[in-house]
Amino acid sequence: MLRTHLCAELGEEHIGTEVQVCGWCNTYRDHGGVVFIDLRDKSGIVQLVCDPSTQAHAIASSVRDEYVLVAKGKVRARGAGLENPKLKTGMIEIVLNSLIIENKSPTPPIAIGDESVNEELRLKYRYLDLRSPKAYNIFKIRSDAAIATRNSLQKMGFLEVETPILTKATPEGARDYLVPSRVHQGEFYALPQSPQLFKQLLMMSGFDKYFQIAKCFRDEDLRADRQPEFTQIDIEMSFCEQEDIISVAENLLKDIFSACGTEIEIPFMRLPYAQAMESYGSDKPDLRFCMPLVEVGDLFVDSSNAIFKNIAQDSKNNRIKALCVKGGDTFFSRKTLGEAEDFVRKFGAKGLAYIQIKENELKGPLVKFISESALNELVSRVKAEVGDIIFFGAGAKKIVWDYMGRLRLKVAEDMKLINENEYKFLWVVDFPMFEKDEGKTKALHHPFTMPNDLDKEDIEEITSVAYDVVLNGIELGGGSIRIHKDSIQKRVFELLGISTQEAEDKFGFLLEALSFGAPPHGGIAIGFDRLIMLLSKSQSIRDVIAFPKTQRATCPLTLAPSKVNDEQLKELHIRVKNELK
């Protein structure tokens, strides 16, 4: 090796030792002929000092930012008052007796470690962006988590199996990335949205316990926590029940967090889907703070406010939710109340009513429409005290859940009620099997999930053996017990409006495999990128992927996607139509 130590490994215990270090010039300073260089490698920074009397001085004087250096010298203590407590190596420096410039660099277009730089520019020069020790530490966490995943699951008897990347297009919710076949003219492979069907087939193959750190692809609109290609920890096991998979996932997450320096407690809290929606307006609630939504529709059945009264009289389809904010009367001004109303309107609210809890009175636009006894019950039910404010959401239940859940989270963020150093896990269970979207029936998870009762008249009341693991308000993973009988799978396809012919065309191989003695089985997939984002306290999923895509699904570094030449298209039997003008 060209070096004896990494930069940040050096400390006071090395004073008087001859060392050789390698890295990049982070900063260069010339103080009256004495040259100071902050040398940076993956571990951190150490200060180099070169006096005018040394042979290395001429070379040191020519060094500039991002030059690649090999430096040799003796470690000494920094002078009194010259220590740098911000650096791990801030008590020492290296006095140079030899310096080699291995490579030069022009002035870099971005400052290493400067996160204020436009993200697209950072991604264009990602190889520079990744030079910071902070970036390296993120990928050290990612590596440690991957190793811990393999060790943990192997210890529990799981077999790692790789499933195909080139596969068949199947409807799993998002659009597929299609790959044209050169050999089979006019036919296409699809990149897998998940290994779902293959891992089920492995259970039918008798593999019993499977896992894979799998690359998945979805052609969907991007958000801060989405990428067109992403990684998940994929798990499937046979002859199991929901409890078995939950136990495996909890022990796995405990091992991963422990490997990354954090201990978590298991088992995790559980919450039925219906309760999560009613109490938090979300199927992935953040429980690092309390502030639940409370149903108060019954208190408005006899209200003199016609709008609230009409809403309250249809308790099956509507909701009136109260959100009591502790200390909110002091926090919210007329201006911030207006901003809160503007916020919920963006998500379908018609307005935002409220009641302020004063010392000797209740104030707000709703007070005059509610009887004194109902007001007393309201205050008691939401546990309101002097200085609090109660917000109200009223209307169709799904809309109210959504905007009141978002308001709950926004208020907690604005009032700084969330402990950023806390990890709060939660299982959401008993999901609906189906949902209606613009009149069309869809599977809430996916169509291979085991339903609890297919004979209910109202299809939206059918629940499934499905479960999501949530961490700090982010869905970390989801899974289910799978359908293992072809008759049930065919019935689910039928309820989803998938014809017998379509089911045969798209899933014939699965239906046939199910008919050959498929065992009861189930599994879970945990979003690996999201997990690392939370473990490393990163702001975006793009920070934890070495070469991510932008929110426009492009790569500024390689300029992908790009056009290809006509010869390549001809080989694939493809002709690109010019966009009509």
Swiss-Prot record:
It is an enzyme of class 6 (ligase). One of its GO terms (molecular function) is aspartate-tRNA(Asn) ligase activity. ATP binds at R218, D219, E220, Q227, E475, G527, F528, D529, R530. The record marks H31, G81 as: Important for tRNA non-discrimination. L-aspartate binds at E172, R218, H445, R482. SUPFAM superfamilies: Class II aaRS and biotin synthetases (SSF55681), GAD domain-like (SSF55261), Nucleic acid-binding proteins (SSF50249). GO terms for cellular component: cytoplasm. Keywords: Aminoacyl-tRNA synthetase, ATP-binding, Cytoplasm, Ligase, Nucleotide-binding, Protein biosynthesis. It is found in: Cytoplasm. Its EC number is 6.1.1.23. GO terms for biological process: aspartyl-tRNA aminoacylation. Residues 196-199 are annotated as: Aspartate. The keyword Glycoprotein does not apply. It catalyses: tRNA(Asx) + L-aspartate + ATP = L-aspartyl-tRNA(Asx) + AMP + diphosphate. Belongs to the class-II aminoacyl-tRNA synthetase family. Type 1 subfamily. Aspartyl-tRNA synthetase with relaxed tRNA specificity since it is able to aspartylate not only its cognate tRNA(Asp) but also tRNA(Asn). Reaction proceeds in two steps: L-aspartate is first activated by ATP to form Asp-AMP and then transferred to the acceptor end of tRNA(Asp/Asn). Homodimer. This is Aspartate--tRNA(Asp/Asn) ligase.
